[in-house]
């Protein structure tokens, strides 16, 4: 019997046995209903997720990086999360990194066999000069991807912190990691298509890890992204609105301080809250480890 048969992500969903003969409305309703399994899976793993947020937060505070490693959908989700962090939080592109089996070209076109070689996982970590300060997060819905296992093995060998995220219980990759999340949303509507519920589950976990890790290092004030990088017109307007929300000033005043603060939302807020100039605001932030304290 194939080893895959016993993995949660490969099991058939009895509710969708007749998917090919359902009406469009029936199948739409089914796919929506099946997503409830995602939230239940996350709730069941909430303690593990919280622990991992603590781990990644500490790593960032000590100058370490978060490195996502995955193949196929899992790898693409890691990249999606990583590339959104620089514009949202003004972190360096090397702070949170997404690696995918087969390299960047695999993001848009599958690279056959790339995920089956554990050495490729190690090689990709060598290319980014992984250190013991970093955290490697291996992502594999099936919990058995050789590329991810190779990466985790190498990370362990240099004493980097390792985390495994899978969508099956007793996942193989869990045994290669210091911490693990085994969030099981149930069999897919389309058997084995882990871009569906498993992919959604993984994406939500990564959302939580990256967002709350950024909160822990002062990138958020209240629930405002005060380190947003205003790289387009929408984000420039959002920046001014954030200043208004955080300080209670009107739009014109926010716009004025935005310019005085060299287009830094965080600095503008500190200037307003502390009634100080640009240089004084920078000093206050440095003293407070880049946190805004009202």
From Swiss-Prot:
CDD domains: SIS_Etherase. Pfam families: GKRP_SIS_N (PF22645). It is an enzyme of class 4 (lyase). It comes from the Bacteria. PROSITE patterns: GCKR, SIS. SUPFAM superfamilies: SIS domain. Pathway: Amino-sugar metabolism; 1,6-anhydro-N-acetylmuramate degradation; Amino-sugar metabolism; N-acetylmuramate degradation; Cell wall biogenesis; peptidoglycan recycling. Keywords: Carbohydrate metabolism, Lyase. The keyword Transmembrane helix does not apply. GO terms for molecular function: carbohydrate derivative binding; carbon-oxygen lyase activity; ether hydrolase activity. Residues 56-219 form the SIS domain. Its EC number is 4.2.1.126. It catalyses: N-acetyl-D-muramate 6-phosphate + H2O = N-acetyl-D-glucosamine 6-phosphate + (R)-lactate. One of its GO terms (biological process) is peptidoglycan turnover. The active site is at residues 84, 115. InterPro entries: Etherase_MurQ, Glucokinase_regulatory_CS, MURQ/GCKR, SIS_dom, SIS_dom_sf. Homodimer. Specifically catalyzes the cleavage of the D-lactyl ether substituent of MurNAc 6-phosphate, producing GlcNAc 6-phosphate and D-lactate. Together with AnmK, is also required for the utilization of anhydro-N-acetylmuramic acid (anhMurNAc) either imported from the medium or derived from its own cell wall murein, and thus plays a role in cell wall recycling. A lyase-type mechanism (elimination/hydration) is suggested for the cleavage of the lactyl ether bond of MurNAc 6-phosphate, with the formation of an alpha,beta-unsaturated aldehyde intermediate with (E)-stereochemistry, followed by the syn addition of water to give product. PANTHER family: GLUCOKINASE REGULATORY PROTEIN. NCBIfam families: N-acetylmuramic acid 6-phosphate etherase, PRK05441.1, PRK12570.1. This is N-acetylmuramic acid 6-phosphate etherase. It comes from Francisella philomiragia subsp. philomiragia (strain ATCC 25017 / CCUG 19701 / FSC 153 / O#319-036).
